[in-house]
Amino acid sequence: MSETQNTQTKRQRTLVGKVVSNKMDKTVVVLVERRVKHPIYGKIVMRSAKYKAHDESNQYNEGDTVEIAEGRPISRSKSWNVVRLVEAVRII
Protein backbone atom coordinates (compact mmCIF):
# COMPACT_ATOMS: atom_id res chain seq x y z
CA MET A 1 0.00 0.00 0.00
CA SER A 2 2.87 2.39 0.68
CA GLU A 3 4.31 1.75 -2.80
CA THR A 4 1.16 3.03 -4.51
CA GLN A 5 1.17 6.13 -2.35
CA ASN A 6 4.78 6.89 -3.24
CA THR A 7 4.25 6.49 -6.99
CA GLN A 8 1.23 8.78 -7.10
CA THR A 9 2.14 12.46 -7.16
CA LYS A 10 -0.13 15.21 -5.96
CA ARG A 11 -1.46 17.40 -8.79
CA GLN A 12 -0.50 21.03 -8.49
CA ARG A 13 -3.28 23.64 -8.48
CA THR A 14 -3.02 25.99 -11.45
CA LEU A 15 -5.14 29.01 -12.34
CA VAL A 16 -5.22 31.39 -15.30
CA GLY A 17 -5.76 35.10 -14.75
CA LYS A 18 -4.91 38.64 -15.75
CA VAL A 19 -2.08 40.71 -14.24
CA VAL A 20 -3.60 43.82 -12.65
CA SER A 21 -0.49 45.16 -10.87
CA ASN A 22 3.27 44.73 -11.22
CA LYS A 23 4.43 47.61 -9.03
CA MET A 24 6.01 45.40 -6.36
CA ASP A 25 9.49 43.93 -6.78
CA LYS A 26 9.34 40.30 -8.02
CA THR A 27 5.58 40.16 -7.37
CA VAL A 28 2.52 40.47 -9.59
CA VAL A 29 -1.14 40.63 -8.58
CA VAL A 30 -3.26 38.28 -10.71
CA LEU A 31 -7.05 38.62 -10.99
CA VAL A 32 -8.72 35.23 -11.51
CA GLU A 33 -12.37 35.22 -12.56
CA ARG A 34 -14.69 32.22 -12.48
CA ARG A 35 -18.31 31.64 -13.36
CA VAL A 36 -20.66 30.26 -10.69
CA LYS A 37 -24.34 29.50 -10.62
CA HIS A 38 -26.21 31.53 -7.99
CA PRO A 39 -27.57 29.10 -5.36
CA ILE A 40 -31.07 30.60 -5.19
CA TYR A 41 -31.74 32.37 -8.49
CA GLY A 42 -29.80 30.07 -10.80
CA LYS A 43 -28.21 32.92 -12.75
CA ILE A 44 -24.57 32.57 -13.80
CA VAL A 45 -22.52 35.26 -12.02
CA MET A 46 -18.82 36.13 -12.11
CA ARG A 47 -16.74 35.69 -8.96
CA SER A 48 -13.20 36.99 -8.79
CA ALA A 49 -10.19 36.67 -6.51
CA LYS A 50 -6.78 38.36 -6.49
CA TYR A 51 -3.62 36.33 -5.88
CA LYS A 52 -0.09 37.62 -5.33
CA ALA A 53 2.32 35.55 -7.40
CA HIS A 54 6.12 35.40 -7.50
CA ASP A 55 7.72 36.77 -10.69
CA GLU A 56 11.48 36.23 -10.32
CA SER A 57 12.55 38.22 -13.39
CA ASN A 58 9.94 41.03 -13.32
CA GLN A 59 8.97 40.24 -16.91
CA TYR A 60 5.15 40.35 -16.79
CA ASN A 61 3.22 43.58 -17.42
CA GLU A 62 -0.26 44.78 -16.54
CA GLY A 63 -2.84 43.23 -18.83
CA ASP A 64 -0.87 40.05 -19.55
CA THR A 65 -2.73 36.76 -19.15
CA VAL A 66 -0.61 34.34 -17.10
CA GLU A 67 -0.85 30.89 -15.55
CA ILE A 68 -0.01 30.61 -11.84
CA ALA A 69 0.67 27.51 -9.75
CA GLU A 70 0.42 27.01 -6.01
CA GLY A 71 3.69 26.47 -4.18
CA ARG A 72 5.35 26.90 -0.83
CA PRO A 73 4.76 30.19 1.02
CA ILE A 74 7.28 32.83 -0.07
CA SER A 75 5.94 35.56 2.21
CA ARG A 76 2.92 36.24 4.40
CA SER A 77 0.59 36.81 1.44
CA LYS A 78 2.44 35.17 -1.46
CA SER A 79 2.31 31.42 -2.12
CA TRP A 80 1.78 31.29 -5.90
CA ASN A 81 4.37 31.25 -8.71
CA VAL A 82 3.94 32.47 -12.28
CA VAL A 83 4.39 29.42 -14.53
CA ARG A 84 4.02 30.84 -18.03
CA LEU A 85 2.71 33.67 -20.17
CA VAL A 86 -0.55 32.69 -21.87
CA GLU A 87 -1.14 35.91 -23.81
CA ALA A 88 0.76 39.19 -23.85
CA VAL A 89 -1.03 42.54 -23.73
CA ARG A 90 -1.34 44.37 -27.05
CA ILE A 91 0.05 47.89 -26.90
CA ILE A 92 -1.56 50.19 -29.47
UniProtKB/Swiss-Prot annotation:
Keywords: Ribonucleoprotein, Ribosomal protein, RNA-binding, rRNA-binding. Transmembrane segments: none annotated. One of its GO terms (molecular function) is rRNA binding. It comes from the Bacteria. GO terms for biological process: translation. The keyword RNA-binding applies. InterPro entries: NA-bd_OB-fold, Ribosomal_uS17, Ribosomal_uS17_bact/chlr, Ribosomal_uS17_CS. One of the primary rRNA binding proteins, it binds specifically to the 5'-end of 16S ribosomal RNA. Belongs to the universal ribosomal protein uS17 family. PANTHER family: 40S RIBOSOMAL PROTEIN S11 FAMILY MEMBER, SMALL RIBOSOMAL SUBUNIT PROTEIN US17M. This is Small ribosomal subunit protein uS17. It comes from Bordetella petrii (strain ATCC BAA-461 / DSM 12804 / CCUG 43448).
